[in-house]
From Swiss-Prot:
Sites of N6-succinyllysine modification: K10, K23, K220, K227
Binding site for urate: T68, D69, F170, R187, V234, Q235, N261
Function: Catalyzes the oxidation of uric acid to 5-hydroxyisourate, which is further processed to form (S)-allantoin.
Catalysed reactions, as listed in the record: urate + O2 + H2O = 5-hydroxyisourate + H2O2
Post-translational modification note: Acetylation of Lys-118, Lys-164 and Lys-290 is observed in liver mitochondria from fasted mice but not from fed mice. May be deacetylated by Sirt5; however it is unclear whether Sirt5 mediates deacetylation or desuccinylation of Uox; additional evidence is required to validate these results.
List of residues that carry Phosphotyrosine: Y288
Chain positions found as Phosphoserine: S39, S63, S231
Name of the protein: Uricase
Length: 303
């Protein structure tokens, strides 16, 4: 028999802002076999639930708690029963399950990220069941759904590391008594892209949109293959990515981007009698600059 502890009970001087619990990093490899042709999705899923009652917090009454081990098992079973066509749909399936199965669940939040496996391919021929890990950007999504509400769907790219050796500069910035940074017309530009966007609706080709955003990120960072494109600041490149994404992809409502400025500094070799003309550089992990920005579509004018 459960014993509830009422030593504290409800405190009139504090109130709950938000509560939640769940299971993080539930890993699954789903294999779809169509004869000898196999397709895979490997994902890590994190689930957070909010319950109507707060009696578990107030009194130690666990009677409404769905064990986190059950949450883990549910993720496994839904992968078996529903498959993983794409991670956004899988996340919506998980939200739908908990909200429809348990009346006392008021909110479900699901985060899923996909391991970047790519099918072996040579001379245009794709292997039927072999894959290679290609860390050229991780596909992730977040879906949050309130009871009696629609799912709010975000997708994103993270861990997309890019570098260009020219066509970047930083000039005309504010200077005060603490400024030692020199202006530069030509420098290396390296960053690790974090990009997250919200969809206006759910009847979209999520994987096609993700691929299109990734292509836009690479296009605006690098520019034309034969000559590149000049970047006067990380901020300008970030904004250009957002504007092109929202102009070309009407399914996207808003977009958040974070671009750390990963530094590569010229190594002074003058004491060794050598002139190093930006040929040998020192990568510095930290400290680093960090540039962020979020844009959304403007509401149409009522005039």
């Amino acid at each position: 028999m459960a014993h509830y502890h009422d030593n504290y009970g409800k405190n009139d001087e504090v109130e709950f802002v938000r509560t939640g619990y769940g299971k993080d990093m539930v890993k699954v490899l789903h294999i779809q076999r169509d004869g000898k042709y196999h397709s895979i999705k490997e994902v890590a899923t994190s689930v957070q639930l909010t319950l109507r009652s707060k009696k578990d917090y107030l009194h130690g009454d666990n009677s409404d708690i769905i064990p986190t081990d059950t949450i883990k098992n549910t993720v496994h079973v839904l992968a078996k029963l529903r498959g993983i066509r794409n991670i956004e749909t899988f996340a919506m399936n998980i939200c739908e399950h908990f909200l429809s199965s348990f009346n006392h669940v008021t909110r479900a939040h699901v985060y899923v990220e996909e391991v970047p496996w790519k099918r072996f391919e040579k001379n245009g021929i794709k292997h039927v069941h072999a894959f290679i890990h290609t860390p050229t950007g991780t596909h992730f999504c977040e879906v949050e759904q309130m009871r009696n509400g629609p799912p709010v769907i975000h997708s994103g790219i993270k861990d997309l590391k890019v570098l260009k050796t020219t066509q970047s500069g930083f000039e005309g910035f504010l200077k005060d008594q603490f400024t030692t940074l020199p202006e530069v017309k030509d420098r290396c530009f390296a960053t690790q892209v974090y990009c997250k966007w919200r969809y206006q609706r759910r009847d979209v080709d999520f994987e096609a949109i993700w691929g299109a955003v990734r292509d836009i990120v690479l296009q605006k960072f690098a520019g034309p293959y034969d000559k590149g494109e000049y970047s006067p600041s990380v901020q300008k490149t970030l904004y250009d990515i957002q504007v092109l994404s929202l102009s070309q992809l009407p399914e996207i409502e808003d977009m958040e981007i974070s671009l750390p400025n990963i530094h590569y500094f010229n190594i002074d070799m003058s004491k060794m009698g050598l002139i190093n003309k930006e040929e040998v550089l020192l990568p510095l992990d930290n400290p680093y600059g960090k540039i962020t920005g979020t844009v959304k579509r403007k509401l149409p004018s009522r005039l």
